[in-house]
């Protein structure tokens, strides 16, 4: 087994691509499966970017069929595939090391990235099937995944280019709608996400930046920014925004809520 980036701690060795310390089998919701995928994705991105020299050396073409695994704890590992048939979870691309010396390094890394993206999707929807996700849960899971840049886009630099083209004027807090600071009433979770009408004399640049803010805001439950003209509500604890329909809050009900806490924050407090 070839370890990389502390990967052995993530899966427990021996081609344990499904391991990750047993974390996948504790998941039950689309959001939990997404967190599992996000951790695996982060580990694989490390292998192909910050840890690329180590990854390159581990992928010796003289060795047997090797795979790149990503684990939920954001580590990675280059190792042999799982021995059990069928495997515990879908396996990543086999033999990534064989093409290393026959290709330009950037092209080879991009090829591994494409296969890694494919593997992440197969693992995510394997868990979706295992946990009996219905159509709505599968849709939420796909939308959350689709809102992330692919590994291929990160490795090739396409993700940075897209981000610059999409939000040239946005700040680091652009995922929060500017309507949140308009008034105390709106900051207490009653603001719709639709962009406020510009006052007379307001600059065009300001309006464009505000529009970018709205476009980048994702619902904390379904992971999409669909329905910008619908009612949205903000958690006063974690400051995440949610579709009212996703958290079962109506505008009328919100009028009587002094301080709104989302389901995640409510559950955390109950467990504590």
UniProtKB/Swiss-Prot annotation:
Q: Which InterPro entries match?
A: Alfin, Alfin_N, PHD_AL_plant, Zinc_finger_PHD-type_CS, Znf_FYVE_PHD, Znf_PHD, Znf_PHD-finger, Znf_RING/FYVE/PHD
Q: What residue spans carry the Low complexity bias annotation? A: 168-182
UniProt-annotated site: Histone H3K4me3 binding, residues? 232, 236, 241
Determine the domain of life of the protein's source: Eukaryota
Which Gene Ontology terms cover its molecular function? histone binding; transcription cis-regulatory region binding; transcription coregulator activity; zinc ion binding
What Gene3D superfamilies is this protein classified in?
Answer: Zinc/RING finger domain, C3HC4 (zinc finger)
Q: Quote the SMART domains the UniProt record gives.
A: PHD (SM00249)
- Tell me where it resides: Nucleus
Zinc finger spans (PHD-type)? 216-268
Annotated region (Disordered) at 1-24, 162-218
The role this protein plays is: Histone-binding component that specifically recognizes H3 tails trimethylated on 'Lys-4' (H3K4me3), which mark transcription start sites of virtually all active genes.
Instruction: Family membership, please give it.
Output: Belongs to the Alfin family.
Protein name, per record: PHD finger protein ALFIN-LIKE 6
